[in-house]
Amino acid sequence: MDFGEQYQMALEIRPAHDPTKSYGFCGVVVDTTNLQGAIFTWWRDEDGVWQSKKTITIDPVPADADDLPDLLKGFGAVPPLVTDIDLSLDDKYLYVACWGLGEMHQYDVTDPMNPV
């Protein structure tokens, strides 16, 4: 699947644990246009074709440009840098490690197309 050239480093793929389901999640480290992290949900449609949709966006955190490395000064923000995702064994929760922010996020993915 091609998420688009701005989505760099799709590091983690996590399929549903339920063997009757044909969906999962992919964590993307950074969007080069705005420093957001992203999670895409992927699934097989009725015709057997694999599809994907961005379902979670994690915004960068604003920061003083003087505190940032040169590469990030123009953005004025710290990117979340999604480095790992894990799906709970009951397929209910997705855990997302945001290394750049030093945070772990939890999303309810009971409805994989509409995480909360």
Each model region followed by its residue ranges:
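Hydrophobic beta-strand segments that make up the repeating blades of beta-propeller
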Residues: 24-26, 94-96
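Residue-level recognition of a conserved intra-blade site in WD40 beta-propeller repeats
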Residues: 13-17, 87
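Short loop/turn segments immediately following beta-strands, especially the blade-tip
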Residues: 40-60, 106-116
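Structural signal for beta-propeller blades
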Residues: 32-39, 102-104
